[in-house]
């Protein structure tokens, strides 16, 4: 191979020599490729002709065989971006780099997220490439105070704006002369006076536009800086030309446009300041989450209590938390009891009772008892840290609706420059032949009214504010695409156990005396069955003392037999009673039938062959489940229940909460197939679940929603996590999605509409340059301000017919 290139890839999933041989053989079948795969190092070294192949082709080949290629992710802070053309260009360049799998650049957060193959490239190369484009970039430091950095940058913008405004204000007086024929002192019309004020604005305050324009043009791109630099320079240097003519005596009344260039720069700086200030408010939700973290912890060392910084707490440390203090990290109580305010996590204002062996979550508030706990998760592994990570990823992700704006942003500035040149030519040749000034003014107006910034900000600002507001309410979207997909949902499928119900059986009905209950609970206390646990807890709530069982025997399919203090106990179904010649009074038989029809597990109790009681146990429906399902129905969404339970139990639960469609007797592995059936009917399906067996269905659904009290597997598989398990958050999540997408559409309509209408109006000469500049400055501000309305969004779903 004359022209060769070598690359190394880390391969995952190989288990034996057959795997490495298979990959090597497949790669070597490609033309002009020489590949060697090492099982020990788990690396593939590939020599190839870059004119025929690229690295992505090898990666696709390996992945098609069922193996993986190791990918690393880095987040970068980028400064110097002024509009969507900047972020679009950086993203395009990064995605063309060797070894980059995917890169997204967010103008609002001023960050890039890059997935790359570590054997092909590294974070330093990514940073260097961005810097070559003319922007400052660095690897994101999670320990760095981003808020203070942004505050300093905002303060710097304000200082520049004030200086620019002070210098431009006297020049602004000249506009009032043109508009209202006002009389002003002669000093203001003096060319030297105007030159002295306008020059520092143009070349000191406005130098950032020249630098940005130069860097972009040097790298074959164009952004807002190009438009501002060209537009203001045209006005400034034409004024210099007129001033030279005045000095030479060629004219006694030069037509100067110093005020146009200076006021334009001031207005644009004003718009950028307002935009930056508004953008800083979009990240408030993340700041509020970060502020919830405890700053220090009280650790028990050698019997002494010592206060240490939070980052010095390790897994296994013994911590003491007193009333009114925050739980420092995730852990388990080993001593004491208390009530914990978990509202920051679940939104539930009522404190939760906690005892020994109960789990506590970091950053929740200890209300009224001193507890000793063991740290189980610290640092980035805590529940709050994971929530913050999910919110950050969602806020920096892109929704599919943004693609059109990104495509247009890439071509926007060159097109606008072309329109401005065409405007100049048409004016000077056709509209006002031979007259330079009207052509110049119209073309400057075209340059400065065009605003790619509004296009670039339309989607990410709404996503940031919308996902932040949702997170404040306990709803975690894992990305912008899931925000967009959720608003299309027309069918929601709910798992029963742990989702609609609490997932733990409790005694719902008992008829009998305390002695019978005491004997029953004693008989059941050594059993690990959930129903037995419910009975024992019920007896303890009644403060009954449980004794010891003399004999115990399970009767498969029927119940149990036990001897306690010379009492012979039978607990079970009708068949067990019949086998022991115990007759059932009609009212007991009717009660039994009634409980079974309601989906409860009913048990008969006999002491010494005499029927003494009946008890019913059931997994109870969650608070607000019925209200949540009613809200979904009001929104025009079909609701179905999917469960492995028998049809009678499922129908009973469905009736309680108002669900019409019940899919029962389903094996765990069949759940995903049931979701697929609904999708084949053209439905957009969301699956809500909490267990390991729900994970395949969560992945198969258009949107997977995990209940936060569920397993990590379910949460990992889901697109949305509902913290705390309150079903009322499901309609709220859908409404948050609808409100966010509606806001994005409003922003895009304004951004496109503004440019579509503004550019022709400017080209027709109907706008003075300073008016065009003011409109451009305020267009992006209006987009961000509209997005900020989502901060006040009340997550109350609307009726479909409302």
Curated annotation (Swiss-Prot):
GO CC list: plasma membrane
EC number in record: 7.2.2.8
Reaction(s) this enzyme catalyzes, per UniProt: Cu(+)(in) + ATP + H2O = Cu(+)(out) + ADP + phosphate + H(+)
Positions of the HMA domain: 5-70, 72-138
Annotated residues for binding of Mg(2+): 690, 694
Regions that span the bilayer: 161-181, 192-212, 224-244, 256-276, 411-431, 438-458, 748-767, 771-790
Membrane association type: Multi-pass membrane protein
Keywords, comma-separated and alphabetical: ATP-binding, Cell membrane, Copper, Copper transport, Ion transport, Magnesium, Membrane, Metal-binding, Nucleotide-binding, Phosphoprotein, Repeat, Translocase, Transmembrane, Transmembrane helix, Transport
Binding site for Cu(+) 1: 16, 19
Active site: 495 (4-aspartylphosphate intermediate)
GO biological process terms, semicolon-separated: copper ion homeostasis
Residues that bind Cu(+) 2: 83, 86
NCBIfam families: ATPase-IB1_Cu (TIGR01511), ATPase-IB_hvy (TIGR01525), ATPase_P-type (TIGR01494), copper ion binding protein (TIGR00003)
Function noted in UniProt: Involved in copper export.
Family statement drawn from the similarity comment of this UniProt entry: Belongs to the cation transport ATPase (P-type) (TC 3.A.3) family. Type IB subfamily.
Name used for this protein in its record: Copper-exporting P-type ATPase
Species: Staphylococcus aureus (strain USA300 / TCH1516)
Chain's gene name: copA
